[in-house]
Structures are given as C-alpha cells and as structure tokens.
Amino acid sequence: NRYVRKIEKRENPDLIIIGIPGGLMPFNKTLTNNFGIIAFLISQAVTPDFSIVSVLYDDIDVKYFNMLNNSFRYKYGFEVDCFNMAVTMFDAVTSIETQSLHFNFLDHAAVDDIINAKYSKEDIPVFNILNPEHKSAIIALIIEKLSAYAVREQLKTGGRI
C-alpha cells in the first residue's frame, strides 16, 4: 500500500495498472497455485477501481463467471468488472501426470468464437484482449467507470462538472 501511495504522490499518474502474477485460487489439492496468496495480499493493500480477471480458455458454464465474481467479492473485497478469456488452455492430463502446470495455446479466433457464442450478452462482460474490438470495449468500460468516479469526487468536494 505504501509503495503504491509513494508512486502516486511522486509521479501523480492518471492511472496505475497493477498486474497480479500467478493464480487466484488452487486448481486442486495437488496444483495449488500457491493458494492465491499473492492476490489476497495485494487485494488487502490496494482496492481496485476497475478489475479485469483473466481466466483460462475453456467451455465455461455462464454461471461460473457469476460464482467467480461472488468469490472475488467475499475473498478479495472487490467485484469483477470484466473477464478476459486467455488464449491459454489448462492441460489437466499432462499437469496431473507431471505434477506441474502445463498449458496449450490456441489461436485467438477460437477464443473469439466461444465468447461470441456463449458470453456476449452476460451482465459481466467477457472479452479477448487480443481482439482489437474487445480491447476498445474494455478501454471504453474503464474510461466510463473512472470518469464516473471523477464526477462523484468533484461533486463531493464542491467542484463543478
């Protein structure tokens, strides 16, 4: 928290982007992703104004995204603004055999296809950041939400819009 505050005071940036490495939760009892400890620690120090959660490619049930959002709300203290579906797919068979994480990489068009087919009308949007249209949509969402914060802050301090 002090580190981010120091950057904020020293550089006065318009935006601070914090990427959290590693997994947010275990895959299973063997492949633990360090239990999402790094994500938990960072979430206790810094509350995001906008959050993008990346998920691995899979044919995920729509309800799963809502469950993830609830999990983040209670575990990390913030809600998910949008999901990014990565072009990376978890290779469970090889990972279990080798007791280490293995992934397969896909063409981003395959990810676009599943997003368009299953997730295009969800309350919490699902994007593929490698798709230029999706990238523009994410940027628009960020600007919209952060602009609303700026307006509220001006009203709170008695400033004009």
Regions found by a protein language model. Name each.
Residues N1-G22:
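Conserved nucleotide-sensing/catalytic segment adjacent to the nucleotide-binding pocket
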Residues R5, N69, I139-I143:
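Generic detector of well-ordered alpha-helical segments enriched in charged/polar residues
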Residues E11-N12, K118-I124:
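A structural motif corresponding to the C-terminal end of an alpha-helix
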Residues L15, I20-Y119:
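Conserved catalytic-core segment of NTP-binding enzymes
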Residues P125-I161:
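NTP-binding/hydrolysis catalytic cores, primarily Walker-type P-loop NTPases
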